Amino acid sequence: MGELRRSPLHERHVELGAKTAAFGGWEMPIEYAGRGVLAEHAAVRGAVGIFDVSHLGKARVAGPGAAEFVNTCLTNDLRRVGPGQAQYTLCCDETGGVVDDLIAYYYAVDNVFLVPNAANTAEVVRRLAAQAPAGVAVTDLHTEFAVLAVQGPAAPEVLRKLGLPADGAYMSFADAEWKGRPVIVCRSGYTGEAGFELLPRWADAVPLWDELLTVVTGLGGLPCGLGARDTLRTEMGYPLHGQDLSLSISPVQARSGWAVGWDKPAFWGREALLAERAAGPARSLWGLRSNDRGIPRPHMRVSGPDGAELGEVTSGTFSPTLRQGIGLALLDRSVTAGDEVAVDVRGRVSTMTVVRPPFVSASPR
């Protein structure tokens, strides 16, 4: 692996005593000194938290027919949304495997802004650029914009205190200004709570972070790292690319078919996904709730009461809200909700119940 890239807020994280780790080729904060993941998680569920997720990619597809072109490539149907609306979508290969899951911001028929995952940005840009018609440009803007996520019940109040738009519908976005500086504001997130993702220019990230952090902490909130982001998204059953979605785990298997425009005449992987949907997937993503002290972790083996192997855990953690182990697992088509399964937790058998996520109730809208 080459040298890790850093967020424009790296020095701020160091000042806050952040524990950092590699994630998608970036050095990012996992948790902050003095509190830890459990406190950061609780802050988001009960008040508000601020995350630096500037490692996320950014790209723009622009030119005559740009939106129509994107719609023939990515799975979801951009015709379902209009200008000022964002949409969760997938970039698949010809086998139906998931190259990435990402957010498409629909600006206009000739302008679509994309936010892929950090490690997959270059590949998404490469694939789109290779197929782009004459006049349509695909531009990698990875370090042109930072991304700050403000998440939790008090998130709208935080934005109002900064004079930023806070009343938009879920998955709507707007070009706004903060102290004369441009910032994209989207009503979205990865936690299950009310929240916003703010995209300032890279050079404007530090002053915006500083003011946001002051307001957030004044409302009883905390800066939060990727550790809490992972526990929050797992409680909601949101998939993480590379674990619950991948080149070998299709949208049909991962229950992400809602993000596929099945009636569209074209998108990458269409034929393979239609065939898999018609036949029924051989395995599907389920939730697991521990019945003892066992905590599921990725790649742990899952078996039935008779010892037959049923699949493996793809994501797992201790749920700070439920105070028990929870996880996501890719399991055989014979499995159904309510089944009890055995998970090999470091050589010890832990009994878990198969459930359909989310594990907790939340209100992202």
Swiss-Prot record:
Enzyme class: transferase
Signal sequence, renumbered to the chain: none
Domain of life of the native organism: Bacteria
SUPFAM superfamilies the record matches: Aminomethyltransferase beta-barrel domain, Folate-binding domain
Protein's UniProt keywords contain Transferase: yes
One Gene Ontology term from the biological process aspect of the record: glycine decarboxylation via glycine cleavage system
GO cellular component terms listed in the entry, alphabetical order: cytosol; glycine cleavage complex
EC numbers for this chain: 2.1.2.10
Catalytic activities: N(6)-[(R)-S(8)-aminomethyldihydrolipoyl]-L-lysyl-[protein] + (6S)-5,6,7,8-tetrahydrofolate = N(6)-[(R)-dihydrolipoyl]-L-lysyl-[protein] + (6R)-5,10-methylene-5,6,7,8-tetrahydrofolate + NH4(+)
Chain's role: The glycine cleavage system catalyzes the degradation of glycine.
The protein's name in its UniProt record: Aminomethyltransferase
Lineage per the UniProt record: Bacteria, Bacillati, Actinomycetota, Actinomycetes, Frankiales
